[in-house]
Amino acid sequence: MSNENHEELNDQLIVRREKVDTLREEGIDPFGEKFIRSISPEEIETKFADKSKEELEEAAIEVSVAGRIMTKRVKGKVGFTHIQDRFHQLQIYIRKDAIGEDAYAIFKLADLGDIIGIKGTIFRTNTGELSVKATDFTLLSKSLRPLPDKYHGLKDVEQRYRQRYLDLITNEESQNRFVMRSKILKYTRDYMDSQGFLEVETPVLHTIAGGAAAKPFITHHNALDMELYLRIALELHLKRLIVGGMDKVYEIGRVFRNEGTSTRHNPEFTMLESYAAYEDYEDVMDLVEGLVSTVCKQVNGTTEITYGEYKVDLTPNWRRVHMADVVKEYVGVDFWNVTSDEEARELAKKHDVAITEHMTYGHILNEFFETYVEEKLIQPTFVYGHPVEISPLAKKNKEDERFTDRFELFIVGREHANAFSELNDPIDQRERFEAQMKEREQGNDEAHGMDADFLEALEYGLPPTGGLGIGVDRLVMLLTDAPSIRDILLFPTMKHRD
């Protein structure tokens, strides 16, 4: 910001504070009390849209409304202002002889951004605009800082994220997005409830960081003198509930990963995880298709949407393809016929796929997929058959034990869901954890730790179970055409200002 702009802002701050002093000297509280509203600007728009000027004059409907001043014009003993509540504006017509000399003096002191309460009657102007003719004016809160330019809002994208309250005042698209986010969460819960799932809550503080390959945030419990981790997934506690006989459960909650930020990643984000006893990953595919298509239809009125440059059809009957097949399709490498880790490494070298020391056949297949295939999957696609090495909690495939009964959902080149037939063999699970521990020793700091308590729970018997994880934030991005995860998080994590 230039020095000139700084000086202008400072001048406005001084003037507004002087007005506060003036009001207090007159015995008026610039930061008022409760105000009872009988109607909102939006409701006035909706209820009286079809009423003529003459009908409104005859009805003389008295209302009480409140909102933030967005425009103001004063000419002698008459003034006009538009107030905004959420993102609906209403014109207020103010006459000195109608509200009284003292109240009119307060109105003249009002600035853009001030919050006011109005009592009056609804009428329609000569130009046809629904308005309220004020009979009473109340200052409810004085704005000490000027709002951003009403025509351009916040031009600085980072400022929109840091000062979301200003973004919501000045940017209708942003406010609508967060209303849609709320509806998406509601409709998601409605759908899961309709499928017989029970919503539960599980701990945020874990003694072991498990359920996903990610770096945790670490904290310390003073009274117990022990390290705890902010959860990186919801999975392991929810599966304990399946062991306990709660056959269908889900949770929508925050998880935390101590990793980088990007347009798709925030250190804390919202996950939906669900688990259903006596089901498998194919049942979960059906659940995901139904959930996403239903919620999309409810919030957008259609299952055909636009995301950025792409037209996406979320109508059910999505493509289902094995990871090895889709790699062969896009890259021309047939991993079905790769018989050794060494052969896989040679293929990686030949195709410029970056690998590290701990990587074996399954890791390398996944690297091929992520390098050459993932971003090309625009229409909804279930990619299944993930290798055992990268799926420590998933059940092995009976026909080929190199792979698991796991899938990920890809839309517009991004992962939107991860699911599998849960591994319920405690002996196999222990061996998988041990293999993960070896990977950690070789430098894979995202490898899963040993969770003895979870293993003990499995030993009591986990029925065949289909498990699901959906990144709620990415789903909201998709359904609202948001280019960045920060656009759909009210208060995204931001680096300290310099």
Swiss-Prot record:
Record's subcellular location: Cytoplasm
Cofactor requirements of the protein: Mg(2+)
SUPFAM superfamilies in alphabetical order: Class II aaRS and biotin synthetases (SSF55681), Nucleic acid-binding proteins (SSF50249)
Domain of life: Bacteria
Residues annotated to bind Mg(2+) 2: E415
Cofactor binding annotation: Binds 3 Mg(2+) ions per subunit.
Reactions it catalyzes: tRNA(Lys) + L-lysine + ATP = L-lysyl-tRNA(Lys) + AMP + diphosphate
GO BP, sorted A to Z: lysyl-tRNA aminoacylation
EC number: 6.1.1.6
Uppermost EC category: ligase
PANTHER family named in the record: LYSINE--TRNA LIGASE, CHLOROPLASTIC_MITOCHONDRIAL (PTHR42918:SF15), LYSYL-TRNA SYNTHETASE (PTHR42918)
Family from the record: Belongs to the class-II aminoacyl-tRNA synthetase family.
Protein name: Lysine--tRNA ligase
Annotated source species: Listeria welshimeri serovar 6b (strain ATCC 35897 / DSM 20650 / CCUG 15529 / CIP 8149 / NCTC 11857 / SLCC 5334 / V8)
